[in-house]
Amino acid sequence: AFLLQTPRDMGDFRLTDHHGEVFDPARLEGQWTLIFFGFTYCPDICPTTMAFLNNFIQQLEGTEAADTQVVMVSVDPARDSVEQLAGYVPFFNPEFIGVTGEFLDIHRFATALNTPFRKVPGQGTDYLIDHSANVVLVNPRGDYHAFFKPPLDLAKMKVTYRSIRVLWDR
């Protein structure tokens, strides 16, 4: 994991979750959040990372499990509607949250979290998106705290996550 020396305020944002509810900074407060930027038509990195995050969450216990949420933010809002995300994200874990919104709002949010993405040009409607596979960690104040860089390792990520939480609780 790469810890930010000083956790960073992510600014204001207003997106929509896969239930059609508002997803804004208030939704990140009071618990730890793991954010992954992906898209439902992604052939490899996204399903692999979502399955990994489900395994990770299953390994947590007690308060760790209770106050950790996982969010997948779509980098393909043109195809990833609320309905599309509702059929995709809960497949990995019914507690996971899928988020979409206007392209510029998502781009601004991704930029604040150092997770760039771009559409691969010249593929018509069957396009791919180049995107970061980092998993961002947001602290209970709603600030960008750290990120995990692939290849993700379950045992290492668990130990690191616990350490970060212990330091936070001091």
Where are these regions (language model features)?
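N-terminal "domain-start" segment that seeds a small globular fold
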Residues: A1-A26, A51
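Thiol-based oxidoreductase modules, predominantly thioredoxin-like and allied folds used
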Residues: A65-D80, E95-L104
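Thiol-/selenol-based redox modules, centered on thioredoxin-like
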Residues: Q123-R170
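Short active-site neighborhood of thiol/selenol oxidoreductases, capturing the structured segment around
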Residues: F23-T49, L53
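Short, internal strand/loop/helix patches
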Residues: A86-S132
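Conserved helix-turn-beta segment immediately C-terminal to the redox Cys motif
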Residues: Q31-W32, T48-M72
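Extracytoplasmic/secreted envelope proteins and their assembly/folding machinery
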Residues: M50-I57, V82, A86, F103, ...
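Short loop/turn microsegments at loop-to-beta-strand junctions
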Residues: M10-G11, T33, S132-N134
